[in-house]
């Protein structure tokens, strides 16, 4: 009995601390092509580097000068993953009026995510923003390094 008391006192002096660490993800280097056509639909290409893995990514196709928290419901869209680490590339198909017809992306080690559509209000200059999710936890908003402007030239052919 005395031995159990000694063991109990020893164990009560010891503590075990478990810390749950969010594995996280990091989106960096988000860029888009610089123009879209005003005479027809354009696939606005984008690319970014992903560290970690995403379960979902949100897209914000908003007027230049606004932030994602100001985006209206129709200006945002989410694609479910998984989206694997590495260089991620994709496109948003937009009309001259600013409507997003589809979003698609591919990441290393996964099949492309099927195009899905959303409609946005027509505004000329826009910027793409992203936010990734891992394990249901939202990461920070990531702003594209450049904004996208309309091109009304008759030979419009946006290059990546």
Language-model-derived ranges and their functions:
Residues 1-14:
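Sec-dependent bacterial lipoprotein signal peptides
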Residues 14-160:
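Non-catalytic macromolecular-recognition regions in eukaryotic signaling proteins
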